[in-house]
Design a protein with these regions (language model features):
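Extracytoplasmic/periplasmic proteins that interact with beta-lactams or build/remodel peptidoglycan
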Residues: 1-88, 103, 108-137, 141
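Beta-lactam-recognizing serine transpeptidase/beta-lactamase-like catalytic domain environment
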Residues: 45-53, 95-146, 151-302
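Short hydrophobic alpha-helical segments used for membrane anchoring or interfacial signaling
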Residues: 89-94
Length: 302
């Protein structure tokens, strides 16, 4: 506890040299885990010699909590990331949202904050490194890319414009606005439906679906799935809500321009349809959305 923290926390029974949870589960459940100090009040004479005990208050240990983490799965997740520059892995039970593993790379020694002495080099590496090891990448927002296509697919299905038996012609390129939006294999996949489009991750199939239903339908479905909002995970103090664009967002200035001067463009919907540019989501949000597909249609809280 720092000096400034002590001024506030001392009212709750903390001492100046106490250790407290700084991040993650230990931060979220600090009140449950911490317990309370005990002590003995004694009477002494003028020179400090013990005379008698006036009372004893026993200390109380904090309560235990049981995590849903599966240690074996957690170890595998961390091993997979070990030789990677950066990334995140989340393993979630789609039936109830239980987190079985969550890993982020780069990471740091969680015992660092409890040390009395913190070497300057280690401190600088932790707080000022370009790799940002303090960021939990499982809870930070990024362009999702092709994993977003399932959202566009649901928007097409729910709109009624692109029912389950829809077949669309894919091609090397489709022009929206002034830009050619390419298929990732530069050839196309012929006439395909949803299942094959997801299997081969066709860009031009989902360009057509997204452009057909429009940005606001994709946005509507994304909100049902839990995007652009906190996932509900207990360690949400570290969580980014991300960004899912819609027509109101574009009309209001996109967060950087003047209202009315940043209209929605055809290029925007093409990019949005495959999870690029105007879509930023977190890995935990993606896991939550895919759980809906896996469990038959209901939203769970991680």
């Amino acid at each position: 506890i720092t000096e400034s923290e002590y001024e506030i926390l001392s009212n709750d029974g903390y001492r100046f040299d106490d250790l407290i949870g700084r991040t993650g589960i230990e931060y979220a459940y600090e009140d449950i885990l911490r317990g309370s100090w005990g002590g003995e009040m004694i009477e002494v004479d003028a020179v400090g010699n013990f005379q008698r005990s006036l009372g004893v208050k026993p200390s109380q240990k904090g309560d235990d909590i049981q995590l849903t983490i599966d240690l074996d799965i957690q170890k595998v997740a961390e091993e997979v990331l070990e030789d990677k520059i950066g990334g995140a892995i989340i393993v979630m039970d789609p039936r109830d949202g239980a987190i079985l593993a969550i890993a982020s790379k780069p990471t740091f020694d969680l015992n660092f904050f409890s040390r009395d002495f913190k070497p300057e080099e280690e401190y600088n590496d932790l707080f000022f490194s370009d790799s940002k090891p303090l960021f939990n990448r499982a809870l930070n927002a990024y362009d999702p890319g092709s994993v977003w296509k399932i959202v566009t697919a649901l928007a097409g299905l729910e709109s009624g414009q692109f029912p389950a038996n829809t077949l669309l012609e894919t091609s090397p390129c489709i022009i929206y606005g002034s830009q050619c939006f390419r298929e990732h294999n530069d050839l196309g996949f012929g006439i395909i439906g949803y299942e094959d489009a997801l299997r081969v991750s066709s860009n031009t199939f989902f360009y057509q679906v997204g452009y057909g239903v429009g940005v606001d339908k994709i946005y509507e479905i994304s909100q049902i799935l839990g995007f652009s909002q906190l996932s509900g995970i207990e360690i949400s103090d570290q969580e980014d809500v991300g960004l899912i664009a819609n027509s109101d967002w574009a009309q209001s200035g996109r967060g950087w321009g003047n209202p009315g001067e940043t209209p929605w463009l055809p290029e925007d919907i093409a990019s949005m349809s495959i999870g690029q540019f105007v879509v930023q989501v977190t890995p935990i949000q993606i896991a939550k959305a895919y759980a809906v597909i896996a469990n038959g249609g209901y939203v769970v809280t991680p």
